[in-house]
Amino acid sequence: MAAAHLGMPVPVYMAEREEDLALRKLIDTLKISAGWDLEANRMAGRLYHFVMGRRAPVDTRAYVTTFGDKLEKGVHRFLWDNARDIDDLCKDFQNGPEYERLISRGMLSAKRMYDTYVLRTEEGGGEGAVYESALQMYARMAAFFTCQCFAYPSLRKTVSEVEGGSGRMESGLDFFAYFFKILASQLVSCATPVMRSAGLRQSYLASCFIMNPDMSTEDKTLSAVFRDLSPLLCSKSGVGMNLTNFSSGGKNVQSCLRLINSQVEFCNDKNLRPVSVAAYMELWHEQIEEFLAAKLPENPERCQSIFQGVCVPGLFFRLYEQNPDSQWHLFSPKVGGHLAGLYGDKFDEEYARLVRHGLYSSSLPAKSLMFALISAIIKTGSPYILSKDAINRHHWFETQGNAISYANLCAEVVQQPHEFTSTCNLANVCLPACLRARGEGEGAGAAGEGEGADRLSPLTPDLEFCFDTLRAAVRAAVYMINASILGGVCPTPGVRVMQAERSAGIGVQGLADVFAKLGRGYMDAESALLDARIFEVMYYQAVRASNQLVTVGGAPPHANWKNSKLSRGEFHWESWGVQYDSLFIERQLWEELRESVTKHGTFNSQFIALMPTAGTSQLTGLSESFYPFYANVSSKVSNKEEVMKPNITFLERVSPSDVPLLKYHGGDVSKLPPPLAAKYRNFLTAFDYSPEDQIRRAAARSPFVDQSQSFSFFLKEANVKSASYVKNLILLGHGLGLKTIMYYCRIQKQTSLTALECLQCTESPDSGDGVGGYKGGDEEPRSPEHAQCESPDRCLSCQ
């Protein structure tokens, strides 16, 4: 400020820099109370958007000039040619209430936006870096989707005729405005690869990949790990990888897992968006015990940067339930490898034949393997548990002889890659955006075609759930996913082959917020009813929109349409035994859709997949996925700082006079005195609800989730002192037919809501009391985010 002392004018850039420093100090001050002060949290977020907005280009022309070398040619040209109109559209949006909501999601939302999602001119985001603003990011995405519509006439025609209202959408700006409004209002959130890379040159937009490589020899194993896996990790996406056929000349599977682990760690070095691999193995493999031990804390060479999953045949569960001392036999893939292709009765028959002829490598009591499985779960939070019978019985085509025994990184996408590489293409609907003031818009009608709202809450008569908005969101998600499939780059030839099946996965976020805003608890009967209706409508609308791409747009059905169950008119929910009288949507509408689908086909092979959404839920400030609230106050810890993560829906309803007591108990409603506990009962967390009830709720929505759901166990520390408790949950999930019986096991310590850790269990799953069977874990306590997994951001691709 020497110039000022000499009476000289201060340069504008110096004044702005000093103002930014002052604002950052104010932000740091507000962050201290952001956990309990809703306005402080919102103000900190607004100010952070303001500060970072100064580092963004001033208008669209300046944006294209700054980032033009990164933009795909068509997107570059569209933004440049329509710059003035786009500026006007963005300005109108900024002057409306939706922009205020966008920048008022809190400090964590703003930090996440600029740390992870927006473009910058310097990868590290240095002092001189120029950033996209939030609206410029959404404009880039909208421009990409618009360009794909004009590149693919079927997409353009469908969007124009279905979304055009009384008149068709004709100009590029019409399409841009349609996509921009949905994205910027956060009605639909795309997966992280799309948010970061849509519209860029040579952009990888797939969320996750699934591999089933041949690992029967040393050469083939090395080829799978270095030739096939490496390009997928370098594309910054997560991978699900089947290891069931690993034999590799007698080598130990842990050495293979360490190879994979090292690749993941290398790719994550200096990487803004960490990636990982979920390795899957079936329970009959001769090295299953070594596989389960690969991540245990007592293993000096544990593979802490990857994840594991097991696929369990129904036969194992039945043997265990009949007699835990029954012998379970393990096989070499060279002898029993064909078991991998079988499920149900065919698996049972072949397993029995191999045992009868003494072709097994070894055997052990079923309870010993169950204990090894549960011990790994309690110590590490995984492996994921898939039901082999369920994922194959309910798959979109018959898999007997080539059965599926693996999933993607977050266990919600189930596909058969054959000798190629399957791809996940994801988006999620922000369900609270479907709430509206009662009486607005259409009246009640048939759920499939004009249902106005679901009126469930006399306690909060000002809000109702609008199925019109939900259907519009699902249609938009279908268009965006298909634009990403058609316009993205495939990292390997195998990915390109499987993209022809055009598998889509539409999920949700904010389900718990919807129930709370309607004045209901997560487990209330009315909430359960709305839960099932939401996913029925989503499945119906996704199939219908995909069918319209064929009937309206003239696109061909996906590559494997003739082999699909839908080609025979079989909806996913019918394989669950669901009858018309239990459905929300009228029978006539389902039958009309069946007729159209059978006659014309669908553009996509799959439709609904419920992913975790941990990343995009931070952008919106909503609860994750379909889960109950995880905590009412927690924090997000990164290598830079700790940012408070309050439950915004909770804070909006907290009386100021109740804050001291709520703060004393860390927002834990279950610890409040009875009157206050009753007042805030709608904000109980996932740890407060019965895990059995959560499993039943997951089973109730399963008929409408044609892929799977990242269903997790939320357990209190006292529960896992008895391994039999976890065992019973697994058996219940199997009995109710869940495809993903368990994605992750989160354990809440009794001492503190925000200090969670994995525990060590040393008692048998068949001992009931667990007395003396538990010892404290030797890992340090973790924040809520770190309780979920060792690498909390590893599933950004799915979010």
Curated annotation (Swiss-Prot):
It catalyses: a 2'-deoxyribonucleoside 5'-diphosphate + [thioredoxin]-disulfide + H2O = a ribonucleoside 5'-diphosphate + [thioredoxin]-dithiol. One of its GO terms (biological process) is DNA replication. This is Ribonucleoside-diphosphate reductase large subunit. The record marks 795, 798 as: Interacts with thioredoxin/glutaredoxin. It comes from the Viruses. Disulfide bonds join 208-424. Its EC number is 1.17.4.1. The lineage of its organism: Viruses, Duplodnaviria, Heunggongvirae, Peploviricota, Herviviricetes. The active site is at residues 408, 410, 412. Ribonucleoside-diphosphate reductase holoenzyme provides the precursors necessary for viral DNA synthesis. Allows virus growth in non-dividing cells, as well as reactivation from latency in infected hosts. Catalyzes the biosynthesis of deoxyribonucleotides from the corresponding ribonucleotides. The record marks 208, 424 as: Important for hydrogen atom transfer. Belongs to the ribonucleoside diphosphate reductase large chain family. The keyword Oxidoreductase applies. Substrate binds at residues 192, 207-208, 238, 408-412, 612-616. It comes from Equine herpesvirus 2 (strain 86/87). GO terms for molecular function: ATP binding; ribonucleoside-diphosphate reductase activity, thioredoxin disulfide as acceptor. The record marks 743-744 as: Important for electron transfer. Heterotetramer composed of a homodimer of the large subunit (R1) and a homodimer of the small subunit (R2). Larger multisubunit protein complex are also active, composed of (R1)n(R2)n. Keywords: ATP-binding, Disulfide bond, DNA replication, Early protein, Nucleotide-binding, Oxidoreductase. It is an enzyme of class 1 (oxidoreductase). HAMAP family: HSV_RIR1 (MF_04026). Gene3D superfamilies: 3.20.70.20. Residues 765-799 are annotated as: Disordered. It holds the Pfam family Ribonuc_red_lgN. Residues 776-793 have a biased composition (Basic and acidic residues).
